[in-house]
């Protein structure tokens, strides 16, 4: 099969690496890609927002399957446009991608189909949002309705923080994404990311992960797209997975079909595991980044065969095989992230990681300049490891990371701390 992968981050490098291992693959292309992806795929210089060029490329190369990595082209309707041209594509329609594209849409769906989530209000002006916040009190959560690259959420511990967050949304901090605001109940518990692959009818669990949103050690500083992750999430016991499928995922699949937008693609539930069980924080309609990297490290099954089954509506015939070992990934980011990122610094000695057992390096915001790898984005490298325990995977990843010569890079030194503490307690 000839496959076109769309995207250029660490998530897409992990997908490319896994797709490239499939015996079904004849040729892999990636638009835009990065220097890490270039090792397993032929890169095409087409941006993810240039739908016409992507469609033309898919036709010219006789692509059998398109796999869309990031959320923005899905919310913008790329999958619909490709399907209309007779191209097989893995990813939800524009209507189904509203689960990620509009927080308000998802909250209304939860209300209609009795899916457990925090109480909420939707507002298109600041005075009404502020009145609701004053009525509810803090802590409370303020979210921009639309896509804001994972940065449109403020968990306000004080009333003033919440009111300021409303102002920044309506003053245009998130552009069109902040034209509507969702204010919701603060949920207490432990967060987990839970993934399913879906074909419109069937949802098949792809496992859980826990990511680390804040930029600094000890979960301090501003939110980011994610500074590291590990899988599986210990809080997602078999019983909790069964409850999540029964109480959240299956009603969502039924609800989306009922409103005429059946969901196919990756459904990523951001969960809060509370004393009452799992509650939905938000849905995303693609793999998480960096959660995808740890899921791919643990997946033994053929990813291309799996995606094919999803596109053809055959997931009810599929069973998956996983490594028993946990996986952990640490993000190396460029100085200044998540604010003003310094780009262009040279990264050396990446080849030293190739010989380390159980370690895989995924490229994210990297580029090739004059024969050298340079930082071209905020999150730049993902050092990923598997081992018998999370503590061992953590040690392995950090040991590998220290071989990289990149003074302008930084990372959190405590990725996986919750799971490591749990392992110590359970010894």
Swiss-Prot record:
Which key words are in the record? ATP-binding, Ligase, Magnesium, Manganese, Metal-binding, Nucleotide-binding, Purine biosynthesis
Q: Name one GO molecular function term.
A: metal ion binding
A Pfam family for this UniProt protein? GARS_C
Q: What is its EC number?
A: 6.3.4.13
Which pathway is recorded for this entry? Purine metabolism; IMP biosynthesis via de novo pathway; N(1)-(5-phospho-D-ribosyl)glycinamide from 5-phospho-alpha-D-ribose 1-diphosphate: step 2/2
Quick one: which residues bind Mg(2+)? 282, 284
Looking at the keywords, is Amino-acid biosynthesis present? no
- Per the annotation, how and in what number is the cofactor bound? Binds 1 Mg(2+) or Mn(2+) ion per subunit.
Which parts of the chain are coiled coil? none
Q: Name one GO biological process term.
A: purine nucleobase biosynthetic process
Domain ATP-grasp: start-end pairs:
107-312
Reaction(s) catalysed by this chain's protein: 5-phospho-beta-D-ribosylamine + glycine + ATP = N(1)-(5-phospho-beta-D-ribosyl)glycinamide + ADP + phosphate + H(+)
Q: Which Gene3D superfamilies match?
A: 3.40.50.20, ATP-grasp fold, A domain, ATP-grasp fold, B domain, Phosphoribosylglycinamide synthetase, C-terminal domain
Q: Which residues participate in ATP binding?
A: 133-193
* Cofactor field: Mg(2+); Mn(2+)
Q: Which family does it belong to?
A: Belongs to the GARS family.
What protein am I looking at?
Answer: Phosphoribosylamine--glycine ligase
> Gene encoding it?
purD
